[in-house]
Curated annotation (Swiss-Prot):
Stated family: Belongs to the hepadnaviridae P protein family.
Other noteworthy facts: Hepadnaviral virions contain probably just one P protein molecule per particle.
Organism: Hepatitis B virus genotype E (isolate Cote d'Ivoire/ABI-129/2003) (HBV-E)
Protein name: Protein P
Keywords from the named record: DNA replication, DNA-binding, DNA-directed DNA polymerase, Endonuclease, Host-virus interaction, Hydrolase, Inhibition of host innate immune response by virus, Inhibition of host RLR pathway by virus, Magnesium, Metal-binding, Multifunctional enzyme, Nuclease, Nucleotidyltransferase, RNA-directed DNA polymerase, Transferase, Viral immunoevasion
Length: 842
């Protein structure tokens, strides 16, 4: 006869009609009873032969990916021009006086952030954009390219120009070494004096650093190229004769970098293309040797900057290798040939764009180190997309980076800190990760990009067609033409217009701000926001500012005070270059929603949406069917979040933890499911701990227990000797039930830790319920007044200690000790300070 739910509740002492606690509770530590109950509830984990269940409601195993849904109408979010002030420490010091060592250390960590992986694996460009949506390959390609372009325009990415140089938009930092080695040479007269090594057919002179130049005609590069004149005949002749075997175009691209120390072969392979393009091509077209098959393939390098206006005269020119524009000269192969699309516009714009600033970078290969793809911005906002960057290579394998640990406030610390009668609001930092600048030295390790549309499509469509009559001049150009591609591009043409041409070229980009896909980023963001909040708290001592990652909350005594605080703090953050999203500022009144909890003066509870998820989970939980342990991980993750608010807490979930650890399937018996259901139906708030003096002490030996409650002493013995930790836990439970005190002194570290998961299962569950809301103070055995009674000696009285208890706020480093602050004029308005009135700082 399996154990009924009512009987089980009685065993667990959750019902009123249990006998005296001193008799009942030690029985729960009995191994035999625990084994029998576990067998009755099917908690021992036999090897089950029934097939496992791999899905419960929305929960699948941790590593099985849910199929993402592609939205062709995703909007790319816009990013403000985020530029964090470089002298952020000085700015803060002007605001609040000298900073503490802690704050300075944290702010120095992120100005700039550095990234040193042990080893970096480079992937071919084809893996730059992940084929995550096989039915929307082309659409996803362009949406992702557009997202990357938007990030580059916002100064969040570098664009790799050559092996050793990159360009970016936005304001430069002092650690980004700009290249100013020479200016655009206006006419041929000055070039005649240059030696061959320092110039090559219309490039500016420069010393042999592998880098590109910021020229004074940069803007013309992006618009119609009116200021670029063709070279005169003498120059062309000269460059042609020097560069034997290299086809010399009539126009030269910008910023190409022949290096003085290298020979003609190297120059041919590197300088005959726009900034980074030939290197990209070498990666993208490994089957064409850049040098030997230069004029025949038309694939090896791209000659950009052919004025779009000269479409008519292009037939007389040599074939240029921009894949997109090549269609202009070719015969349509079918009704769905890309030639029809390319001929829609006269001016397709430049093949490549360059940033306002050019900087020197460490040697960066034409490869990527992580793939990117798009997903919904969040479950509530499916209209906008979010870029997911997969840099998981740095968290895997033998060369994985062990990311720094940082303090996450636990539930009790949070409650101690934020549970008060303050008014709250939370600030939304827009694109928080993209505030923190990365040193350019990290660029070679954090590369994203794409191989260009032609390669991307070719890799995905295996059935390439070769059209014989065109073989020879334009090999395989029309292989990519297909109805699907044509229709997709025509639709995308409405969205992106002539940018289709720009986006169809290969590109390699490195991160200039910290990306979200690296384990270092959460750590850096947490350090940064906690330092800023520490500064804000000292500037406004009568208020509370607290942050976890990009979630910043402000609290004040009254709504009017909160509004004036909001204005001041917002202005301060804006002056540092931190961008806030005013539309997403939330005013919470007296119950703050933070980190999944609702925190008010009564304590904390889980937010409503989490309660709904738990209800939903129990509704779909199958009984008497083995459930895959990976699904159990998901279930435990959800239930574990709300466990501190239940009667029995984490110990109630121990059978599930055990099955996950042994990688076995778990079967819910009706009684165990009913027990958990009831546990999660009524949630109790976790209250703030109060400081006070400890008056109640407990102690135990394996054979007996003793209590000191004020001047009263009590003792008792156990029927059979018990392990010492179990005995100490029982003594603490007796102290709580006898005295009702919320503060108990004990000399046992396991009881102090309040983790009851290692005790016999039934005892752990019952003790959690009895000791809920109790705070413990450590008292050394020698001074413990309950020590003598536990050894059976009631006559000797040790003096009662005056042991003060201070609630902790964990390692959340809330209170920085303020150095002396220069005196300021007194505030005209005096607000009653919550620090003095509402609660004491720990």
């Amino acid at each position: 006869m399996p154990l009924s739910y009512q009987h089980f509740r009685r065993i667990l002492l959750l019902d009123e009609e249990a006998g005296p606690l001193e008799e009942e509770l030690p029985r729960l530590a009995d191994e035999d009873l625990n084994r029998r109950v576990a067998e009755d509830l099917n908690l021992q984990l036999p090897n089950v032969s029934i097939p496992w269940t791999h899905k419960v409601g929305n929960f699948t195993g941790l590593y099985s990916s849910t199929i993402p849904v592609f939205n062709p109408n995703w909007k790319t979010p816009s990013f403000p021009d985020i530029h964090l002030h470089q002298d952020i420490i000085n700015k803060c010091e002007q605001f609040v006086g000298p900073l503490t060592v802690n704050e300075k250390r944290r702010l120095n960590l992120v100005m700039p952030a550095r990234f040193f992986p042990i080893a970096t694996k480079y992937l071919p460009l084809e893996k730059g954009i992940k084929p995550y949506y096989p039915d929307n390959v082309v659409n996803h390609y362009f949406q992702t390219r557009h997202y990357l372009h938007t990030l580059w325009k916002a100064g969040i990415l570098y664009k790799r120009e050559t092996t050793r140089s990159a360009s970016f938009c936005g304001s430069p930092y002092s650690w980004e070494q700009e290249l100013h080695h020479g200016a655009f040479l206006d006419g041929p007269s000055r070039m005649g004096e240059e030696s061959f090594h320092h110039q090559s057919s219309g490039i500016f002179s420069r010393p042999p650093v592998g880098s590109s130049i910021q020229s004074k005609h940069q803007k013309s590069r992006l618009g119609p190229q009116s200021q670029q004149r063709p070279l005169d005949g003498s120059q062309q002749g000269r460059s042609g004769s020097i560069r034997a075997g290299v086809h010399s175009p009539t126009r030269r691209p910008f910023g190409v970098e022949p290096s003085g120390s290298r020979h003609a072969k190297n120059i041919a392979s590197r300088s005959a293309s726009c900034l980074h393009q030939s290197a990209v091509r070498k990666a993208a077209y490994p089957n064409h040797s850049t040098f030997e098959r230069h004029s025949s393939s038309g694939h090896a390098v791209e000659f950009h900057n052919i004025p779009p206006s000269s479409a008519g005269s292009q037939s007389k020119r040599p074939v240029f290798s921009c894949w997109w524009l090549q269609f202009r000269n070719s015969e349509p192969c079918s009704d769905y040939c890309l030639t029809h699309l390319v001929n829609l516009l006269e001016d397709w714009g430049p093949c490549t764009e360059h940033g306002r600033h050019h900087i020197r970078i460490p040697r960066t290969p034409a490869r990527v180190t992580g793939g990117v793809f798009l997903v919904d911005k969040n479950p509530h906002n499916t209209a906008e997309s979010r870029l997911v960057v997969d840099f998981s290579q740095f968290s895997r394998g033998s060369s994985r980076v062990s990311w720094p640990k940082f303090a996450v406030p636990n539930l009790q610390s949070l409650t101690n800190l934020l549970s008060s009668n303050l008014s709250w609001l939370s600030l939304d930092v827009s694109a928080a990760f993209y505030h923190i600048p990365l040193h350019p030295a990290a660029m070679p390790h954090l590369l994203v990009g794409s191989s260009g549309l032609s390669r991307y499509v070719a890799r995905l469509s295996s059935n390439s067609r070769i059209i014989n009559h065109q073989y020879g001049t334009l090999p395989n150009l029309h292989d990519s033409c297909s109805r699907n591609l044509y229709v997709s591009l025509m639709l995308l043409f409405k969205t992106f217009g002539r940018k289709l041409h720009l986006y169809s070229h290969p590109i390699i980009m490195g991160f200039r701000k910290i990306p979200m896909g690296v384990g270092l980023s959460p750590f850096l963001l947490a350090q940064f926001t906690s330092a800023i909040c520490s500064v804000v708290r000292r500037a406004f001592p009568h208020c509370l500012a607290f942050s976890y990652m990009d979630d910043v909350v402000l609290g004040a005594k009254s709504v009017q005070h909160l509004e004036s605080l909001y204005t001041s703090v917002t202005n301060f953050l804006l002056s540092l270059g931190i961008h806030l999203n005013p539309n997403k500022t939330k005013r919470w009144g007296y119950s703050l929603n933070f980190m999944g909890y609702v925190i008010g003066s009564w304590g904390s509870l889980p937010q409503e949406h989490i309660r709904m998820k738990i209800k939903d989970c129990f509704r779909k939980l199958p009984v008497n069917r083995p459930i895959d342990w990976k699904v159990c991980q998901r279930i435990v993750g959800l239930l574990g979040f709300a466990a501190p608010f239940t009667q029995c807490g984490y110990p109630a979930l121990m059978p599930l933890y055990a099955c996950i650890q042994s990688k076995q399937a778990f079967t819910f018996s009706p009684t165990y499911k009913a027990f958990l259901c009831k546990q999660y139906l009524n949630l109790y708030p976790v209250a703030r701990q109060r400081s006070g003096l400890c008056q109640v002490f407990a102690d135990a030996t394996p054979t007996g227990w003793g209590l000191a409650i004020g001047h009263q002493r009590m003792r008792g013995t156990f029927v059979a000797p018990l392990p010492i930790h179990t005995a100490e836990l029982l003594a603490a439970c007796f102290a709580r039930s006898r005295s009702g005190a919320k503060l108990i002194g004990t000399d046992n570290s396991v009881v102090l830790s309040r983790k009851y998961t290692s005790f016999p299962w039934l005892l752990g569950c019952a003790a959690n319920w009895i000791l809920r809301g109790t705070s413990f103070v450590y008292v050394p055995s020698a001074l413990n007044p309950a020590d003598d009674p536990s050894r059976g000696r009631l006559g000797i009285y040790r003096p009662l200690l005056r042991l003060p208890f201070q609630p902790t706020t964990g390692r959340t480093s809330l209170y920085a000790v303020s150095p002396s602050v220069p005196s300021r004029l007194p505030d005209r308005v005096h607000f009653a300070s919550p620090l003095h009135v509402a609660w004491r700082p720990p």
